[in-house]
């Protein structure tokens, strides 16, 4: 996307402008960063593995760019998605220097997936970051869609079999 997945100032501005064009609007109420730039343990990968990838500790730069976009009137509030407790706290820490605060996080949360409660709940409670539950019906598992372990063709668990463990 946009010549790379970096959360650079250029890419953030381009992504915001592209979103405004696609939505055919003048401003966005809530703009969320969909993925952390660094490699994290998400979607079934529960153990942290240090990876010397090329991400930069650019939390401050990201917030500075988002601050400019907010001040320009293009977005009103910012949030996170697929972030872990360490990443949430880094953004909270930097926002205390007069930069905008991440007001939401959209992470998986359901009766079958309660990993958010380990670390993130406490941070979000005390730092006033709201949870927008992703996949509250566990990709349909809680609806009875997969009754008797039958997986319908082209369903999420058929298309992404590695997610079976993640939701049960």
What name fits each language-model region?
Residues 36-168:
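Beta/alpha (TIM)-barrel catalytic core signal, keyed to glycine-rich beta->alpha loops juxtaposed to Asp/Glu
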Residues 1-13, 48-57:
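Active-site mouth loops of central-metabolism enzymes
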